[in-house]
Amino acid sequence: MKHLAVLGSTGSIGRQTLEIVRRYPSEFKIISMASYGNNLRLFFQQLEEFAPLAAAVYNEEVYNEACQRFPHMQFFLGQEGLTQLCIMDTVTTVVAASSGIEALPAILESMKKGKALALANKEILVCAGELVSKTAKENGIKVLPIDSEHNALYQCLEGRTIEGIKKLILTASGGPLLNKSLEELSCVTKQDVLNHPIWNMGSKVTVDSSTLVNKGLEIIEAYWLFGLENVEILAVIHPQSLIHGMVEFLDGSVISIMNPPDMLFPIQYALTAPERFASPRDGMDFSKKQTLEFFPVDEERFPSIRLAQQVLEKQGSSGSFFNAANEVLVRRFLCEEISWCDILRKLTTLMECHKVYACHSLEDILEVDGEARALAQEI
């Protein structure tokens, strides 16, 4: 039985993780959980249902209320609380389903304590890929990706020798603005952007999908996750979102993972690997006609892919800067302070002006993060 610490239990990934735990109670047990979002009612419902040994909350008012409602449960507060949850003796696997880099210290400490990591958080590897990879290697920790694309690549690479691999290929739906012309892109609204044709995601991720920044982040993530320095990592547009990742080998063969666009599939495999359990969702129905289309990324429309590749070339502080600057610009767009086109225009300007420097510690990463946020707010 795997004993889980779930960070971000009320978010989309967290809720589906608990759905799998609910389906397989003999395989998984929730030891601790944290929610730093606003859905306090749902979090309390989760605490009642799964009765973890401990939980963490984000402020003192919520902490006091939680302690009163659950007097026999241990509660922790703030960022330090995340670390306490993750390093509990009985925890075997940390499910990092929260967004942002707030959970980075907790994740690093959990790996030092020998905890397995199921990772849904793009920012952790984008900002601290070198540090996380080094910590995982030193402590013999295998990082199991939850993102559908990286989970697909992980499955394609299982049992393969590095020498035979030529390319890692991430697929992108193209987002809600795929078929709009360059002229139309200049006047898209927030509602246009948030109406994703395939995936039901949070606002920030949906905006990232529209700019393809999410795919840029995933290219960086794949580099650190798989450690294949001499292997090309690229993205292609695949509007149907049925194939999630592909590996091309030196002999020209391509292996892919295919399933309906539902995050439950990769979440479940990240939790059960290398075993496979029955899914509550229907798989592919090949009795019906299926269409698979692939298009190259138009870099004039989506400079985010080029920016991500430059991050990998420069490394150092560039990943943290790229991630933080984008977060602020997306927030400004959602607040209707800037246009959709401004996101990529301003992000490109910021990245061109950033002078890359070495970034080896958690303190370095947080310093870059703060610098980028301040500049992105002003530009």
From Swiss-Prot:
Keywords: Isoprene biosynthesis, Manganese, Metal-binding, NADP, Oxidoreductase. GO terms for biological process: isopentenyl diphosphate biosynthetic process, methylerythritol 4-phosphate pathway involved in terpenoid biosynthetic process. Its cofactor is Mg(2+); Mn(2+). Pathway: Isoprenoid biosynthesis; isopentenyl diphosphate biosynthesis via DXP pathway; isopentenyl diphosphate from 1-deoxy-D-xylulose 5-phosphate: step 1/6. One of its GO terms (molecular function) is manganese ion binding. NADPH binds at T10, G11, S12, I13, N39, N121, E123, G202. Its EC number is 1.1.1.267. It catalyses: 2-C-methyl-D-erythritol 4-phosphate + NADP(+) = 1-deoxy-D-xylulose 5-phosphate + NADPH + H(+). 1-deoxy-D-xylulose 5-phosphate binds at K122, S148, E149, S173, H196, S209, N214, K215, E218. Mn(2+) binds at D147, E149, E218. Catalyzes the NADPH-dependent rearrangement and reduction of 1-deoxy-D-xylulose-5-phosphate (DXP) to 2-C-methyl-D-erythritol 4-phosphate (MEP). Belongs to the DXR family. This is 1-deoxy-D-xylulose 5-phosphate reductoisomerase. The lineage of its organism: Bacteria, Pseudomonadati, Chlamydiota, Chlamydiia, Chlamydiales. The gene is dxr.
